[in-house]
């Protein structure tokens, strides 16, 4: 069996696993993020000038577009700071050769403050939408809810815990008629991932293989390598697999078919050692095979469970028995939806384990 995830040796994931990362390794390059940042910078700089030249481009449209540009720039920088900590901070578009290309790195603090400034600027326009026309747009474009989620995560990363709670509560306590909501019924979780764009979703990258030939790849597909590995499975952590089985409410057979599954009728009897990760099993499908020919599942950036756990972590970091109790209540809502046993004790010693 295997106690670690074992990627293919020649892939970027394999290079990371084997500590052989090079500057050319695609998984550690930040160019794509700066492409997004560059486009956002161009919108922020030139959109105001378009109004002067195009009478059909209204102020309300421009303000709405600016909120989306602020969000995409902020989200890109948050991913960069989480992965690289210090990166070049660029807020102007590259339009000619006069722009510098050798830009020094900015500090983590500077970048986080820029993200906060972008979110505040977006919200200050009062043009951030709660919904767009069509579910895919509401979940796939930057809404007011997405801005709140981005700010909550940025504040959590910056250790501004009180502000994190504030922005998380803007989502959790909202009474807007159309808003993201936590899906508390255990059987509903499946809809979050398939078909996606669920009520719980806040922002997710849209893929559509059927209509637009778009595919997100298979980020969880890690194949074994080595002559001693003969099973055609995803290698999964044996200790964590056993721990999940022990904590799961449902019986062994239910765990096996909904969590492990099988490929094209191949049956595996040694589940903890050779577990198969199968997200799209659904319910009541003990004899159904899971074969997907396309890889266009949306990539979920934020959903309500994420925001709730952000608030819980912030409350834990703030400290105090009242905050710990509230944090544990939030965590238990997530656990109970996953049909895991709730935790009923809270102390300075165990709160971080909840």
Functional labels for PLM-detected ranges:
Residues 7-84, 106-110, 119-132, 285-299, ...:
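Conserved, well-structured interaction surfaces
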Residues 86-109:
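Short coil/linker segments at helix-helix boundaries
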Residues 1-21, 41-49, 78-92, 112-136, ...:
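Aromatic-residue-lined binding/catalytic grooves and analogous aromatic/hydrophobic interfacial grooves
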Residues 58-67, 133-146, 347-352:
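A glycine-rich, coil/turn loop motif that links secondary-structure elements
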Residues 21, 56-58, 92-99, 136, ...:
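Short linear capping/connector segments at secondary-structure termini
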Residues 1, 8-32, 48, 169-319:
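Elongated scaffold/linker segments in the mid-to-C-terminal portions of large proteins
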Residues 184, 341-349:
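Cytochrome P450 fold signature focused on the C-terminal beta-domain
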